[in-house]
Amino acid sequence: MGKVKKKRGNTFNYNVDRKKLKRKARKKHAPRIPCEPIRSAWNDGKSVAKNLADMGLAANPNKSLPIRPSQVKDAEEQPGKVIKKPYVLEGLQALASLPSKQTMGISSDMIQYVRHMVENYGEDYKAMARDEKNYYQDTPKQIQRKVNLYKRHHPQDYQALVASRIMQ
């Protein structure tokens, strides 16, 4: 009884796109840094820890802020870390001090929808629910919530809308 012939070496896999794999590996190896101050000061020749140390940032927060209180050493024993790139810290602080954008907005379609409903019906939500523009068949309560959302985000526009309706 003979042996089964042994398969030797690796065979080429035709189902894998090598070009795509190489591109993905390159992206993973050198990720895009979204923060502009850090990206401008980044040195590809240095490691992550050294780059961050030059900027005055901590690569490992557990080492920079230990959980257990360690014994207090003399100030002479602890060498002061020199920050080689202080402009990075200043840039990050400037970015952090900027006001954040509102994440929840109202789409232009919803603004148009609410304006149409308020112009035609005022505060009559039951009539709004029967309107032909109510494509999604919102209930009166759902329409009221949308109108209230519009009131919160655009109070001046809503007041002008109601005032123009009263004038008619």
UniProtKB/Swiss-Prot annotation:
It comes from the Eukaryota. One of its GO terms (cellular component) is nucleolus. Its main location: nucleus. Residues 20-31 have a biased composition (Basic residues). InterPro entries: Ribosome_biogenesis_Nop16. Keywords: Nucleus. Residues 20-40, 59-79 are annotated as: Disordered. It is found in: Nucleus, Nucleolus. PANTHER family: HSPC111 PROTEIN-RELATED, NUCLEOLAR PROTEIN 16. Belongs to the NOP16 family. This is Nucleolar protein 16. The gene is nop16.
